[in-house]
């Protein structure tokens, strides 16, 4: 069956059902006129316009919150044949401002300021969007923000619980996409609708949906073709803090550096992906996903055009402020067992007060592709890293 036809049919059916549910939710929801609470990565500093004589400010009711965080890292590996065995790294330096205007509109602007300057490197905008949040069951977001694909992708680096995202989130949910797209941190330019439906007795919503149209070229890049990426997700929450659902992505990426004289280059590659997963986030954390991808690599015409990945993460509190995470993390670049790379990881996260996080990570890697590589190197190796996060 044609994939585009199937996606359109499913989306039409889903939207009819969601609109019916939304009408019921609107009658049950008493919070429609209140600004939606927004979970921030850091506490930051908030300013509000109060006791002003300006009629415009009284109408706008603007608030603004400033914050940010720094993540510094030291890593060491015993893998042979590498240019370096590790070292110090400034993983993230991010600054943001967010807030509300006219009560119902939430905005966010976030900069990443670490890294050497260059094309798609160094200081750059990662988030710049506004969202209309008048109703829980229907919200509209416009600008540059996270693609709605996968449970882990929307997570801040501060919440993942491990020293990096899973390979599924990195390679297929587009934190660092396998297809050759510049580093976009899982984000793109576009518009998205989303909402939460059917409130339960304890206040949690049973159904969440999200659907967006995007350029498909990643952050800070204009559209380069006549195709828009369609990305969506739908999940249910039978109990508070538990979500079970799936995601779909029908898109295309255009090679902005295409060279017709280079036989390794592809002008564009399709990005047809789907995933299923679950998450439970409370004192305990349980999170797992499977993702599958169809589409090649624009810088390597010979690269496989099918890949998949899966992971399982568990986190348990040990003592106050200390949480231990374990992760089983797999990626198959060619969707074959001979292309499997598996990371077995364990991490300790200790929070010292509200603004400091100390993290110790260990990873054992088993990379089957290294056993068949032209340049031989260790296929099994160990990596340790220490990360310190300061929030402000």
Predicted regions and their residues:
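Outer membrane beta-barrel
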Residues: 52-219, 224-231, 235-244, 313-316, ...
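Outer-membrane beta-barrel "beta-signal"
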Residues: 350, 364, 378-392
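Outer-membrane beta-barrel transmembrane domain signature
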Residues: 117-119, 202, 220, 240, ...
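Transmembrane beta-barrel architecture of outer membranes
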Residues: 90-92, 123-127, 188-190, 227-233, ...
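Detector for outer-membrane/organellar transmembrane beta-barrel domains
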Residues: 51, 235-334
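N-terminal periplasmic/intermembrane-space "pro-region" immediately following the signal or transit peptide
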Residues: 3-7, 13-71, 392
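Outer membrane beta-barrel transmembrane domains
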Residues: 315-317, 321-355, 359, 363
